[in-house]
């Protein structure tokens, strides 16, 4: 079987609330770390979410 192109990554909140999203990423075209600005319901505001590995 062929290796999957898309991988799942965990987007962890930079506000250190412990909240995270799970996103898909194309590992061939996006080689750098994924950073998105999304809503953190624990902090109740929009913050940066940075990529981390899913354990």
Swiss-Prot record:
- Using the record for this protein, list the coiled-coil segments as residue ranges, or answer none: none
Q: Which GO terms describe its molecular function?
A: structural constituent of ribosome
- A GO CC term? cytosolic large ribosomal subunit
Q: Which UniProt keywords apply?
A: Ribonucleoprotein, Ribosomal protein
Q: Which GO terms describe its biological process?
A: translation
Which Gene3D superfamilies does the protein's record reference? Ribosomal protein L33
Q: Which Pfam families match?
A: Ribosomal_L33
Q: Which InterPro entries match?
A: Ribosomal_bL33, Ribosomal_bL33_sf, Ribosomal_zn-bd
- Which NCBIfam families has this protein been placed in? PRK00595.1, rpmG_bact
What is stated as this protein's family in its record?
Belongs to the bacterial ribosomal protein bL33 family.
The identity of this protein, by name, is Large ribosomal subunit protein bL33
* Species, as recorded: Bradyrhizobium diazoefficiens (strain JCM 10833 / BCRC 13528 / IAM 13628 / NBRC 14792 / USDA 110)
């Amino acid at each position: 079987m062929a290796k999957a192109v898309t991988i799942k990554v965990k987007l962890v909140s930079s506000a250190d609330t412990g909240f995270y999203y799970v996103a898909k990423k194309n590992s061939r075209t996006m080689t750098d770390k994924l950073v998105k600005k999304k809503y953190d319901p624990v902090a109740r505001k929009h913050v940066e979410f940075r990529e981390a590995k899913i354990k």
